[in-house]
Amino acid sequence: MVKKLYIKTNGCQMNEYDSSKMAEVLYASHGLVKTDQVEDADVILLNTCSIREKAQEKVFSQLGQWREYKAKNPHVLIGVGGCVASQEGSDIIKRAPFVDIVFGPQTLHRLPALLNERLEKNKSVVDISFPEIEKFDHLPAPRAEGPTAFVSIMEGCSKYCSFCVVPYTRGEEISRPFDDVLAECYQLASQGVREINLLGQNVNDYRGIMDNGDIADLALLIHYIAAIDGIGRIRFTTSHPLAFSENLINAYAEVPELANHLHLPVQSGSDRILSLMKRGYTALEFKSKIRKLRKIRPDIRLSTDIIVGFPGETDKDFQDTMDLVHEIGFDTSFSFIYSPRPGTPAANLPDDTPMEIKKQRLQILQNRLLMNAARYSESMIGSKQKILVTGFSKKSSQQLSGRTECNRVVNFDGPPHLIGQFIDVQISDALPNSLRGRLLEKEMQPA
């Protein structure tokens, strides 16, 4: 009988990538097949995120929901991975003794051995060490699951922003060797992948060693990936403005496969707050890089991350952020109210701004961003857009779905053979979270 694996993933795209690798490594080692139903699973994994407020309590709340299932099915193994696992370690076992395995982001490749150790010794096991880049050397060959794929090119972060736990949960920055990344991209392209998404906590700090001993930056890596037969689009996330180099800006002029969209977290428009955050740049320096980029790609769309209500944020600080949002014209943003993360410097800063004020500021910011997004979506009506068809629409199996270069979802009527192809559609309607399009006549016939 085939045994099954259920994975619940919280957090960022890096976690989504890590979860896919957990599934691959356990399929290769133990033949575990993924299921979307937790009640069908023989192994249950929770891949955690520590970015948002009360992350630890949310983990134990989820584990509490699985406790009864485990009691009724004692053969089921439960594992906790990700950043909360890295922070809490064996304390997870103390609070939830029914958990069998605790592992960190850098030790997911050891899951088969941890699983075997748990079964052999009949006691919980914990491995939250930081074995640098070792995990990539022990993962199975990548398996494409559609025309787009995520490729992790580096791990960790060395910026130590005052509000962020990533350096403590994922370790210092370390880049995968250049040729290892290229080999994975070649393998994925041979399996039908047409769009590569390069991942890292601070992806534009990539410094991969080449076979000749030279060091490749992200811009050079992008050039090489663009030359792979079949790869028609490249994206990368998440970037840090401090490391957004001239070489990377020039890549937008030199590599047409580089998507016409950039996610660049600014966090605040106030120099005072940016300094408290230890971001390492000013609002003017951020705007200068955007101006240079727009000289090369005038119509590039930008998204960002913004924290509202950072300790000590005044009305003027918030207005500086709103002014920057207006000037840059961000298309979308992941914006949220600051919450202190244990062990970070910002957690010790005095914070006397009432929560009600923080909520008001967040609402004002999000209203502006929604207005920006709606205005841009409406401006696309009637335009021809090149999209990569990724599959069927979530709402209707009678429609296809894909993404534009600027990362907008487009749903349209069309034949299934178009899945995995780049095609042109005309945008016919703008909805709050997606666009509707019409397939152009020349795309209707099979190739």
Swiss-Prot record:
Obligatory cofactor(s):
[4Fe-4S] cluster
In terms of Pfam families, this protein maps to: Radical_SAM (PF04055), TRAM (PF01938), UPF0004 (PF00919)
**InterPro entries reported in the protein's UniProt record:** Elp3/MiaA/NifB-like_rSAM (IPR006638), Methylthiotransferase (IPR005839), Methylthiotransferase_CS (IPR020612), Methylthiotransferase_N (IPR013848), Methylthiotransferase_N_sf (IPR038135), MiaB_methiolase (IPR006463), rSAM (IPR007197), rSAM_horseshoe (IPR023404)
Q: Which GO terms describe its molecular function?
A: 4 iron, 4 sulfur cluster binding; metal ion binding; N6-isopentenyladenosine methylthiotransferase activity
**Domain Radical SAM core: start-end pairs:** 143-375
Subcellular compartments: Cytoplasm
* NCBIfam families xrefs: miaB-methiolase, MiaB/RimO family radical SAM methylthiotransferase
Q: What is this protein called?
A: tRNA-2-methylthio-N(6)-dimethylallyladenosine synthase
